[in-house]
Amino acid sequence: EPVPETVPIASREQIEKNNSAYMACPSGSVITSDTNLFNRSYWTNNGILWNENLFVTVLDNSRNVIMKISSLAEGAQENNATVYDWKNYYECVRHVEEYGISAIVRLCRV
């Protein structure tokens, strides 16, 4: 089935003109909760200590924190770095997280 004429599709010409620095980037934050603590989503987690390692289950609560990395592509001329052309750059999007963990440990013997 062909794509209907009413659906807007960017032409190749438009894609080459656009600057990818202004694209929308969806977050990895796909889990929502009604529970908030200090205006941040909060989930109770389970963990286990095994063989001197701590394993903890975590969920993303970073709420759309995204880092964009841009680097000069292989084969691109160094002097081309002053004039923006999307073909001269590699664009990467990273969703980063930082965790602070507090643990209350109960010693038991199995």
Curated annotation (Swiss-Prot):
Its main location: virion. Keywords: Capsid protein, Host-virus interaction, Late protein, Viral attachment to host cell, Virion, Virus entry into host cell. It is found in: Virion. One of its GO terms (biological process) is symbiont entry into host cell. The keyword Cell inner membrane does not apply. The keyword DNA repair does not apply. GO terms for cellular component: viral capsid. One of its GO terms (molecular function) is structural molecule activity. Pfam families: Late_protein_L1 (PF00500). Self-assembles into homopentamers. The capsid has an icosahedral symmetry and consists of 72 capsomers, with each capsomer being a pentamer of L1. Interacts with the minor capsid protein L2; this interaction is necessary for viral genome encapsidation. Forms an icosahedral capsid with a T=7 symmetry and about 55 nm diameter. The capsid is composed of 72 pentamers linked to each other by disulfide bonds and associated with L2 proteins. The capsid encapsulates the genomic DNA, but does not bind DNA. Essential for the initial attachment to the host cell. Belongs to the papillomaviridae L1 protein family. This is Major capsid protein L1. It comes from Avian papillomavirus fpv-l. The lineage of its organism: Viruses, Monodnaviria, Shotokuvirae, Cossaviricota, Papovaviricetes.
